[in-house]
Swiss-Prot record:
Assigned EC number: 6.1.1.14
A single GO BP: glycyl-tRNA aminoacylation
Task performed by this protein: Catalyzes the attachment of glycine to tRNA(Gly).
GO molecular function annotations of the record: ATP binding; glycine-tRNA ligase activity; protein dimerization activity
Keyword terms: Aminoacyl-tRNA synthetase, ATP-binding, Cytoplasm, Ligase, Nucleotide-binding, Protein biosynthesis
Localization (cell): Cytoplasm
Similarity comment: family membership: Belongs to the class-II aminoacyl-tRNA synthetase family.
Protein name stated in the entry: Glycine--tRNA ligase
Pfam families (alphabetical): HGTP_anticodon, tRNA-synt_2b
NCBIfam families: glyS_dimeric, PRK04173.1
Organism classification: Archaea, Methanobacteriati, Methanobacteriota, Thermococci, Thermococcales
PROSITE patterns: AA_TRNA_LIGASE_II
Tagged with keyword Membrane: no
Originating gene: glyS
Residues that coordinate or bind ATP: 197-199, 207-212, 324-325, 443-446
Amino acid sequence: MGEKPDKYEILQDLMRRRGFAWGSFEIYGGSRGFYDYGPLGATIKRKIEQKIREAFQREGFFELETPDITPEKVFIASGHVEKFVDPLVECRKCGARFRADHIIEEALGMDVEGLSAEELTKLIREHDIRCPECGGELSDVWYFNLMFETKIGPYGDQKGYLRPETAQGIFVNFKRLNAFARNKLPFGVFQIGKAYRNEISPRQGMLRLREFTQAEAEIFFNPSETEHPHFDEVKNEKLRLYPIEHQLKNLGEIELTAEEAVKKGYIMNTFFAYYMVMVKRVLLDIGIPEDKIRFRQQLPEERAHYSRDTWDAEVHSERFGWVECVGIANRGDYDLSRHMRESGADLTVLIHYDEPKIVKRLEVSLNLKRVGPKLRKDAKRINELIKSWNEEKKRELVEILGKEGKITIEGYELEKDDFIIREVEEKITGEKIVPHVLEPSFGIDRPFYLLLENSLVIEEDRTYLKLKKDMAPIEVAVLPLVAKEPLKSIAYEIFRKLQKAGFIVVYDEKDTIGRRYLRYDEIGTPYCVTIDNQTPEDSTVTIRDRDTREQVRVSIEELPSKLRELIFGE
């Protein structure tokens, strides 16, 4: 028996040679972490984006488009300036830099997710981990912010960043989007666009890029209403889950229906489970095989700074193992609360009650006669600040005064008697809440690569992409049996007819018919239409199936409708 062919190398060659994708800036030696999509790759990428767009639109979500460049203050508010970092280490001999956690994991075979820079440095020293390039000594570990920094405007006085996610453009527009949704929760907003992360050492081809495409939806909902109204439609869908407890105990995956997963407490509620099913169905619709999809729950130390719980939809790769393609995160009220605090904007939603309620609330203000001499010109400002506090903060103040008898506000030490505190009853017809957010976040580039890998079929006499038919970059190839009249003219006329009918179609008369069939099989074209010597006699052609290689004869008149049925199921 011969050696098993290296599927990865075969696919890389096919992608470069046939116009799917290749490393950027080739004539200048390339730059890691950047990829160009060729004519066929760009078409498949667009089709993936469209599948996701249609799925979001079926849920009634609105589409938005916002700038890639964002002022620094947005990312200060979102926490990215402080927390969007990776641990970095440098070789003291050759100057090469690496992800510290990756180097340690490769050297020791252990998971170091969540360890501090000091703990990572200690592991490097204890195990004498050296530079993988030259064997030199490694520096201490420090943190490196992954955002690309830029200057906005000609004076360079306004710092900005290329966005590391599309989500923040949605959050900062919440006030307008809420008005557009007529103040009615839940509602979803999505954006498809570029994101940028200055990865320390991008590897694994298209799986870790510095510039990539995302399709993110932010679903705003009332945290007290977490039952999805349409959950019954998806409750019997099976999900392959790898929850936290199974990872910690090495128990492997489990398969449950969405309903069972919620009842057993693996998925927090039906709202979350509904969108996990939606994500699975999108991956299937793209053409990812069901047995290559699973959902892995992120461990607490893995989760992003904004996440309360995250499940990753992962797709299996023969070369790279399980690869995260979609993250489904409960972001809570993190983003809207942070932007409210930093911007001063009101990003709440008024929830109306069915019946008015009587509620008790605290009124807290300063005793201005008593504190006036102490606070002087600041008295009025601090009094207004305290009165603007929410109920939770006012009750916190009362609790501190009860325990300690004093509190410091804006640098002034104030005693219990400096305040006027009353509990009052009030009839209210609704309340303002900060909505919570559930976020399904699709990468586009990873599903693109994994779709090709999982579609690649290697046979003795041919290698071809067994793409889902409606995902093929070229849907139909029109081929005259030989490049002679009248076959050429008839074939070209059919080609133009199919173009006008909306198919992605090519005309090709070069090489033998057998070579042409293999050429279009290789790139995933599901059907070749052949114009042969019978065509001038009875106006029929053959349709050849890529997967079975079988051919059927149909009339030229019925050809568009037959192809539409075969490719799109219409």
